[in-house]
Amino acid sequence: MNKIMNTMLKNNFIIPNYNNLNIVDLMRAIYCKYNIKTEINKNVETFKKLIPNNKHLLFILSDGTGSNLINKLNDDSILKRNKKDDIITVFPSTTACVLTSLVTAEFPEVHGIWGWFNYDRNLNINYCPLLFCDRKTETNLLDYGIEPKQVFLQHSLLNNLKTNVNVLFPKYIYDSVYSNFVINKESRHSYNDFNDIVNFIKKNCQNESESYTYLYLTDIDTLEHENGIDSKIVKDKLEEIENLIKKLCENKDLTIIFTADHGQTNITKDIILDFEEYDNMFYAYPSIDYGTASYYIKKGYEETFEKSFKKKYENDMILFKTEDLINNNFFGIGNFKSIAKDNLGEYISICKKERYLINNPNIEKYYGKIKGNHSGLSYDEMIIPLIIIDTNNDI
């Protein structure tokens, strides 16, 4: 066993093995149903056998709702009762990365959207993909003359499905640049609350033509960040989602697939990145997220950075050379696109258990305020549920 794998096991990290059931192959299995030509492997075949062939398919992505939450529900929970398996998400386990894998059916090594923070080497800009803005100034990238197609290099497959496609987003993100990348405006719909969702699905299921609907739920992730994964407010919201699912199950000829982009883990210690020491070594801000970060180190500073970082943060983070993680297929199955690889830095750090890295000069904005987080390799972050409900059967 090589040194990288030893380090992972010693820290109870999940070693991503995409030969096992994973979210990318789940999406490939779903999109195959609608005449999308994509890679077929044993995982895709397994998923295809699990998915009922109903007229309507509702895919629900509940942000932050990892298997760790589902497993704690009562045994009579509709979500827990219908969980078919645990599957792995992609690494880094962060929303922008996973949502892009979801709509492109590609691993991060292909689409290159690495996390909440990205760095584009060609454009020489630190930016937030989901917000489509400059990380430092929050200026919309459109104001710089940067078009979405320059950032999102893989096309969303939702625009090509041979069926009636609907995408349901919360109203506050319904009209964002990223939402427009996901699906054209004609197929995109907003909701204010769960009643809007229930009414939309009921009406849609009355149509004679088949359909695919993608519903994105954001609440669990937000509440976990603010309160921790075991908080009452998270449990209460899960109960609301349970009730939503029960109402949706009143529609017949409907398949419901429920999963997450990632889970979260509780945070007990904040780690502050020493920008004062490292800023002169950086040629770009650290990217990805607050659990996993990528570092862009000027030539000639690599050894100094590595030695200092390992000494300063040895109890809180593990530093890897990016090339080592690439060679061990942490970001996919070994089909790295050069543009995706170029937008990673020379080093990547991963936080140890219950640690949270503030890799941002604005320390006061974050210090002590984050109770749950993700983007790392713990079980809680990487393992997500595969829940499948056939509303024609007893549930």
Positions of predicted regions on the chain:
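Feature captures the catalytic ectodomains and active-site-proximal regions of enzymes
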Residues: 1-395
